[in-house]
Regions:
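Rossmann-fold NAD(P)-binding glycine/threonine-rich loop
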Residues: 97-119
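Generic hydrophobic/aromatic pocket-lining and core-packing "Φ" positions
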Residues: 24, 56, 81-82
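NAD(P)-binding Rossmann-fold cofactor-contacting core
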Residues: 25-47, 121
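Glycine-rich oxoanion-binding loops at beta->alpha junctions
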Residues: 43-77
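General beta-strand structural signal in soluble alpha/beta enzymes
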Residues: 12, 36-39, 92-94, 117-122, ...
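N-terminal Rossmann NAD(P)H-binding glycine-rich loop of SDR-like oxidoreductase domains
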Residues: 16
Length: 147
């Protein structure tokens, strides 16, 4: 099953943070359609050429985002997953590690009643070589072809 391709429109939660900013740039350089990011309180600004919104719902409405890439601190990551789900984002990739287990259990139970798919947390993301990467893995180590 191919989960990301050239048509995937990614919104990065935590884009103004160090990791979110760095990896949003790397994803864009790879060819991924990073449509912007979310940092509450910074909506209406831009960060390194990316538009920033206050919520995932705003980003989804404005840009048609269909994938969320999460780089927020562990105490807020489960809420970020649920926010993306509530915004109707079908694919959520959570890179954050160290999320409290009870928070993630709550988020997983919430996801079970919704249509979103979660990759992670504490994962490198995913890639369709030559198409799109959503995560932290270096693109140059992957090659398109059959497995």
């Amino acid at each position: 099953m191919i989960l990301v391709d050239r048509d995937t429109r990614v919104v990065v939660q935590g884009i103004t943070g160090r990791e979110g900013s760095f990896h949003a740039q790397r994803c864009r350089e790879y060819g991924t359609r990073v449509v912007g990011g979310v940092t509450p309180g910074k909506g209406g600004t831009t960060h390194e050429g990316f538009p920033v919104w206050n919520s995932v719902a705003e980003a989804a409405r404005a840009e048609g985002a269909n994938c969320a890439l999460i780089f927020v601190p562990p105490p807020t990551a489960a809420d970020a997953v649920m926010e993306a789900t509530d915004a109707g984002i079908p694919l959520i990739v959570c890179i954050t590690d160290g999320i409290p287990a009870l928070d993630m259990a709550r988020a997983k139970a919430y996801l079970a009643t919704r249509q979103s798919r979660l990759i992670g947390p504490n994962c490198p993301g995913l890639i369709s070589p030559g198409e799109a990467k959503v995560g932290i893995m270096p693109g140059h180590i992957h090659k398109a072809g059959t497995v």
